[in-house]
Amino acid sequence: MSKAKLLVLGLLTSGCALGWVPAAVPATPAVVCTLAPGQTSLAAGTRHGLAAHLQQYPDLSLATTAQKQAARRLLERARTASERWRNVAAAKASGFNTQLARRAPGDDSIGYLHAEHRRFSADHHILDVKRPESLIYATQPGHRPVLIGVMFSVPRGVRGPTPAGPIDRWHSHLVCMRGHKRGLAPVDGRCRVGSRLTQGSEMLHLWFTRDLRSAFAVHAPVAELCRDGLLTPRACRAGSTGHEM
């Protein structure tokens, strides 16, 4: 096995992530471990990390009153600004890529469509509720896509801002990159020849649930989405199974 493949496998299994100097875009990201041996997740209050390492929900007790207010303002502003794209056809007309991935025969699981706007993704507007990098729709067979949230992202190598303190938690993924092209998820834990393992750009999910804690969850908060009527009863009975589309 090549050294490159060994590096990929080692990073994926050892709890290591790649990090940068905040607000800088380095030529070559440094490799740093973010999990201690035996540790399964990062400490509550950690604001940046791999999606698999961050805790699902923020610990609101760690936030100040001002930070909670900032989180509520961001949530309500995003919810209001995104109302125009509740209909997926309107989102498509505005430039979001709403094309669904093909489902395998018999696949009736929840899909989470991240409808990206390529121009918004490249405009360097950060945490702009009027220009979210992606809209998130729940997709379920036999039903129209339902807008359940937005996703903000920052340019590669830039740390996402945290005006809401520990409530704002920016996640990232390990990807294989070739030159300046977009990174792709490693296939079977390996990067193809000519590409290198690095950490993708940071992202922040914001879910349109009715409570602050679940609204800032790293992954789709299925229980709360069900509670608030954003997923169908059938999908809720099926549990947390779902995938991005």
Indicate residue ranges for each PLM-predicted region.
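A generic alpha-helix preference that emphasizes hydrophobic side chains
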Residues: 13, 23-24, 133
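Boundary at the C-terminal end of the N-terminal hydrophobic targeting segment
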Residues: 19, 24-27
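Primary mode marks residue(s) on the alpha4-beta5-alpha5 output face of response regulator receiver
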Residues: 28-245
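Bacterial N-terminal signal peptides
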Residues: 8-17
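Bacterial N-terminal signal peptides that target proteins for export
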Residues: 1-8
